[in-house]
Design a protein with these regions (language model features):
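Conserved PLP-enzyme active-site core in the AAT-like
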Residues: 1-125, 159-160, 204
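Generic amphipathic alpha-helical segments used as scaffolds and interaction surfaces in large
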Residues: 15, 105, 139-146, 195
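Helix N-terminus capping/helix-initiation residues
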Residues: 24, 61, 144, 178-180, ...
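Short, charge-rich amphipathic segments
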Residues: 38, 44-52, 78-91, 132-143, ...
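Structural motif of enzymes handling amino- and sulfur-group chemistry
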Residues: 94, 110-159, 173, 183
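Conserved C-terminal alpha-helix-loop-beta "cap" of PLP-dependent enzymes
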Residues: 149-212
Length: 212
């Protein structure tokens, strides 16, 4: 009787594994409608495009949450969205209007510079191709392994030409998306390994800071 909303929080930056169960948003919506209460879904990372086409596991998108009937959806402006740090809330007008009337709204709202930056990022999403090209986190996710390997080899050549007394080579590695997103994902990648000879790591770091 006292329940005012059903909240589903997506585990965007962690995973619970083993004998676990979770309720899908599509299962919650009919229950909420039956009791005339809203469904709120916190997606965390705020994905707007399907990442599966870039070799990652499926991450729920904002569009999917809305299509499944969520009344309010919350997600981050940074992380996988690729914009400034901010919290974004979208949903049905009557619930958004209620939030606007809350006394905390003025204290929690973003400044004009953040709003302007967020607007520019969201405009990139008018075309998925443009978003993948211009938003750094998406561009890095979509970069083919061959291109990463090419850049790593180029970096190895540059470092070797500096005369640095070290063993420098390209190695295979696994990368994570980071930023509190897709915690179990491992992407095949390439790294440059540097093993200094006759100098400490600190000395090598200082030398590299002055490379041109």
């Amino acid at each position: 009787e006292e329940t005012k909303a059903l909240l589903k929080v997506h585990t965007s930056n962690y995973r619970i594994v083993g004998f676990t169960e979770s309720v899908g948003i599509d299962e919650l919506v009919p229950i909420a409608k039956e009791h005339e209460i809203p469904v709120v879904e916190d997606l965390g990372s705020g994905v707007l495009i399907d990442l599966e086409k870039y070799g990652l596991t499926h991450e729920p998108t904002v569009q999917e949450s809305i299509a499944h009937g969520a009344d309010v959806v919350c997600f981050s402006g940074d992380k996988l969205l690729g914009g400034p740090q901010a919290g974004i809330i979208i949903g049905k007008k009557k619930y958004i209007d209620m939030m606007k009337k809350n006394q905390l709204t003025r204290a929690l709202r973003i400044d004009k510079f953040t709003a302007a930056a967020l607007e520019m990022v969201l405009m990139e999403y008018l075309s998925e191709e443009t978003a993948v090209q211009n938003i750094p986190v998406l561009r890095m996710i979509a970069t083919p392994l061959e291109e990463i390997e090419k850049e790593a080899r180029s970096f190895v050549r540059i470092l070797r030409h500096t005369g640095m007394d070290a063993k420098i080579q390209m190695v295979s590695c696994e990368s994570q998306i980071g930023g509190g997103s897709l915690p179990l994902e491992r992407m095949e990648s390439r790294a440059v390994a540097i093993q200094p000879n006759g100098m400490s790591v600190a000395e090598m770091e200082e030398k590299m800071r002055h490379l041109e």
